[in-house]
């Protein structure tokens, strides 16, 4: 006797409804799992930023390089979160396809509204693929969360190099009187201050461009104002 699982026998209406409901529930679970991973990565980044801010600003003996190191750690966590976001986006898209093409059609039917969506959905199950690049995921997470952490770290770094009371003992207890003094305070070991400042300016220009100049209406923002 042939295995029923290998035949092309169509499902009855009740079997189809059960299959759709169970599969939708399963995809919500997978989406929620990856959403939790995203939140945990963001929480790690916030914790790292808060810890480094506390270390750097709590004592004059702490070097401003601590904040530069914090920026590198946040960048690493952002890259990890972008990778996780690509997985999350796959399952989020499947859930939204169910909502947009199946449930929405039940509640508010429209004629010939993506009638072949199940065929496209089936092919995506046979050969799952990422729906966005690593760079696109990177810029999206940067724009929504991480740009604010980088901004806070930058403001703290500027405060650190321009306020002698937050630097090592021996410095005068007043704000720097010129840009040259601030640049000199930004030196890091054998690296001169101008090199550190220039590198940081370029780094933040790239971040700003990635966050706001690469913005597009692709994804859920193309269908409404609500996104995850």
Predicted regions and their residues:
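Solvent-exposed, non-transmembrane helices and loops of integral membrane proteins
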Residues: 5-16, 96-133, 222-227
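Cytosolic-side membrane-entry/anchor segment at the start of a transmembrane helix
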Residues: 7-58, 190-194
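Loop-to-transmembrane boundary segments
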Residues: 29-39, 116-155, 189-194
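Transmembrane helix interruption/hinge and helix-loop junction motifs
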Residues: 57-65
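Hydrophobic alpha-helical membrane-embedded segments
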Residues: 65-100, 203-206
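Hydrophobic core of alpha-helical transmembrane segments in multi-pass integral membrane proteins
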Residues: 151-159, 194-212
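Membrane-interfacial helical/loop segments at transmembrane boundaries in membrane proteins
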Residues: 167-185
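Cytosolic/matrix-facing juxtamembrane and C-terminal tails of multi-pass cellular membrane proteins
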Residues: 185-188, 203-228
């Amino acid at each position: 006797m042939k295995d029923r699982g290998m035949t092309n026998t169509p499902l009855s209406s009740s079997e189809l409804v059960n299959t759709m409901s169970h599969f939708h529930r399963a995809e919500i679970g997978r989406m929620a799992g990856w959403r939790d991973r995203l939140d945990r990565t963001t929480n790690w980044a916030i914790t790292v930023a808060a810890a480094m801010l506390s270390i750097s600003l709590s004592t004059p003996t702490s070097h401003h390089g601590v904040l530069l190191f914090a920026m590198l750690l946040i960048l690493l966590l952002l890259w990890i979160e972008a990778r996780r976001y690509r997985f999350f986006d796959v399952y989020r898209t499947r859930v939204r396809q169910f909502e947009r093409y199946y449930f929405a059609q039940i509640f508010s039917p429209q004629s010939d509204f993506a009638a072949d969506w199940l065929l496209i959905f089936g092919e995506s199950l046979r050969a799952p693929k990422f729906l966005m690049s690593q760079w696109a995921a990177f810029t999206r997470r940067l724009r929504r969360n991480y740009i604010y952490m980088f901004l806070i770290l930058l403001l703290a770094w500027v405060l650190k190099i321009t306020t002698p009371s937050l630097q090592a003992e021996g410095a005068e207890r007043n704000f720097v009187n010129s840009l040259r003094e601030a640049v000199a305070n930004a030196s890091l070991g054998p690296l001169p201050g101008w090199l550190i400042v220039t590198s940081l300016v370029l780094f933040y220009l790239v971040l700003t461009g990635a966050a706001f100049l690469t913005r597009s209406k692709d994804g859920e923002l193309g269908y409404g104002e609500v996104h995850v």
